[in-house]
Amino acid sequence: MATPHINAVEGAFAETVLFPGDPLRAKYIAETFLENVEQVTDVRNMLGFTGTYKGKRISVMGSGMGIPSCSIYAHELIKDYGVKNLIRVGTCGAISTDVKVRDVIIGMGACTDSRVNRLRFKDNDFAAIADYSLLSAVVDSAKAHGTKIRVGNVFSADLFYTPDPQMFDVMEKMGILGVEMEAAGLYGVAHELGAKALCVVTVSDHIRTGEKTTSDERQTTFSDMIIMTLDAALTL
């Protein structure tokens, strides 16, 4: 039952999919945290895997960078493979001084400079928000693990190299916790197709201070976030 961008067979994906941007990060998650892992798709090297976590069937697949790529894979996973829960796991940049490098942010809502949700919502503003049951499950898991989290709005940017750095001042004033590139599109697709979605990201760098995590720090913080998210997935 291949689609234009996924060559998995019918039933290859679990109902819950962890959705990092980097396909090699998907491979790392599958090989490190899942058991009985099988690679189920590799079109354009956008790797997808299915395995088990503490006995529960879980999938993980790369989404690529940006809303267009993420939206394509999310659409096909939901519509053609019956995926019910998509949880973006990745990294973001912080703006506010009260958000620190290595913090974990849960995107309750996603603002954006993209027009993609206006295109699907008849040129009106769509409130791109996370599914509450997913958000609640991850918050509960974070508390159980003692993981410090921040819950609030993220900003999904179309441009990585922005020509308007003054926009960061506006974001900070409006309480944006982190800048990434996919959540608003993911939330829009999920709402449109009747699925559930959530964005969970670690702060890898601070846009204001220039502070960045080392590769080792990034891996440790990311791993803590993945375990927290996988344990939440057990309750879905």
Swiss-Prot record:
GO terms for biological process: purine nucleoside catabolic process. This is Purine nucleoside phosphorylase DeoD-type. SUPFAM superfamilies: Purine and uridine phosphorylases. Keywords: Glycosyltransferase, Transferase. Phosphate binds at residues 21, 25, 44, 88-91. The record marks 218 as: Important for catalytic activity. A purine D-ribonucleoside binds at residues 5, 180-182, 204-205. One of its GO terms (molecular function) is purine-nucleoside phosphorylase activity. PROSITE patterns: PNP_UDP_1. Catalyzes the reversible phosphorolytic breakdown of the N-glycosidic bond in the beta-(deoxy)ribonucleoside molecules, with the formation of the corresponding free purine bases and pentose-1-phosphate. It is an enzyme of class 2 (transferase). Its EC number is 2.4.2.1. Gene3D superfamilies: Nucleoside phosphorylase domain. HAMAP family: Pur_nucleosid_phosp. The active site is at residue 205. Transmembrane segments: none annotated. It catalyses: a purine D-ribonucleoside + phosphate = a purine nucleobase + alpha-D-ribose 1-phosphate; a purine 2'-deoxy-D-ribonucleoside + phosphate = a purine nucleobase + 2-deoxy-alpha-D-ribose 1-phosphate. GO terms for cellular component: cytosol. Homohexamer; trimer of homodimers. Belongs to the PNP/UDP phosphorylase family.
